Amino acid sequence: MTESFAQLFEESLKNIKTRPGSIIQGTVVAITKDTILVDAKLKSESKIPIDQFKNSQGELEVKVGDQIDVALDAIEDGFGETLLSREKAKRHEAWLTLEQAYKDSKTVVGLINGKVKGGFTVELEDIRAFLPGSLVDIRPVRETMHLEGKELEFKVIKLDQKRNNVVVSRRAVIESEYNAERNLLLETLQEGLIVSGIVKNLTDYGAFVDLGGVDGLLHITDMAWKRVKHPSEIVNIGDEVKIKILKFDREKIRVSLGLKQLSDDPWTKISERYPEKTKITGRVTNLTDYGCFVEIEEGVEGLVHVSEMDWTNKNIHPSKMVQVNSVVKVMILDIDEERRRISLGLKQCKNNPWMEFSKKYNKGSHVVGKIKSITDFGIFIGLEGSIDGLVHLSDISWNISGEESVKKYKKGEEVLAVVLQVDPDRERISLGIKQLQEDPFAKYVSSHKKGSLVSGTIKKIDNNVIVVSLSEHIDGLIKFLNISDEIMNVHDNKPWNKAKIGEIVEVKLNSIDKKERIIYLSILEKQELKISNDIKKNNSHKQEIDKDKNFSNAMTEAFKAAKNVD
């Protein structure tokens, strides 16, 4: 009976493939902690490690009574036991699936689980495949972090089971999907349409958004109404965004997208909301060498030029006045809605030191300050409020030239001056030092009128004029034509020879040039004046004599008439 059973069993083995590697079917008859007992109707039941029946999450995939495929390793291992493998059977199934997919050009599902030279490794159930870097996507992809760990579809483009070589492509799947989606999308896309998409890539100038078969560019300037330094401030890879189609070139299949266009333009009617000279608070968003940008509301920024930051420090660097994210008070100076530019002022929200000075000091007021600098055109004096006043060269001395008088002063020296003029709008203060004293020229001409006779001392003799000192620091000029014969020798090569330096002369004050501060004198006209005065005097005397004579004659005639009557 036993031999008969053995013979029958041997005969049954002949009817099945019993060489190692064959795939046969078995039944799960028992499950223990470490093994699973499988009956494949061979000489004995086989114990297979339980790990071969678990999935990638560590979950057991079979139960007692399940029919499963296993690979035959050996009918008898020398100890009377049959060796089976569930793992090899699964690999065999996977290869069959890959072969069918390769034959039918269908996709398979796998996971990108590592990076190797030239590409990535992909786990296709129990088979490891190679994914070239150029076939990850339609566009080059440097990082696959956002793809790793996700179930993705691939196409098998090369298969060699003997060499255990499988090459897959994700790009082929995307292209196939894109072609179908693109054709459908291209029929519906139009400018002004609001669509949804997935951010797939970021650059310095914007973000590429997958609209479902067609990529569109969301430029950085169309992300928000406010200033955006980098696209990552607004969107990130993988974000689903709602955007507006701004431009669509159907021939070149180029799509320009806009995000900010979904909200109202904050620049609309901005001049009505912020009239000039309005004072508001804002946040500093950026610093440059020429100023700082201040956000006065969401999406609206204005520039505070460096010249509008401080009343006195015109070239101060913005970083010494404000910092990024600082909240500051500014004034609206100008709005150009067309060019979307706003000029703001920081200093205008502080007291104007020039205006404060003009309120405190009037023309003629005395001020004290230290000399800050001396230039070719005058002296700058530091005044309260950290402002400067200028003493022009012409306002240093009444009698000495500015070039000479300025040499008497040194930087840092404290001086007294008179306020001549204050112009807050032009930020200028004119000061004078000579005005601390009375003008000797004005004093002299006020007491010596034109045409009067004055005396002076000859100070200098030139070929054309004689300089006469009339008073301390007051000189007069006698021109050649106004020199009398008394001091002139026409036969000499010199125009005169009798005039001597130090000689006191009496002259006529001929004319006064107040602008040039020159007094013109004349000796000739002085003599003419004397002659005229003498003639007038003689004429007056003669008239008196004639008057007396006429009176005497009248009396004589009267006596004669009286005598004849008698």
From Swiss-Prot:
NCBIfam families: PRK06299.1-1, PRK06299.1-2, PRK06299.1-4, rpsA. Pfam families: S1. One of its GO terms (molecular function) is mRNA binding. Residues 21-87, 105-171, 192-260, 277-347, 364-434, 451-524 form the S1 motif domain. PANTHER family: 30S RIBOSOMAL PROTEIN S1, SMALL RIBOSOMAL SUBUNIT PROTEIN BS1C. Binds mRNA; thus facilitating recognition of the initiation point. It is needed to translate mRNA with a short Shine-Dalgarno (SD) purine-rich sequence. This is Small ribosomal subunit protein bS1. The lineage of its organism: Bacteria, Pseudomonadati, Pseudomonadota, Gammaproteobacteria, Enterobacterales. Belongs to the bacterial ribosomal protein bS1 family. GO terms for cellular component: cytosolic small ribosomal subunit. It comes from Buchnera aphidicola subsp. Baizongia pistaciae (strain Bp). The keyword Repeat applies. The gene is rpsA. GO terms for biological process: translation. Keywords: Repeat, Ribonucleoprotein, Ribosomal protein, RNA-binding. It comes from the Bacteria. The keyword Nucleotide-binding does not apply.
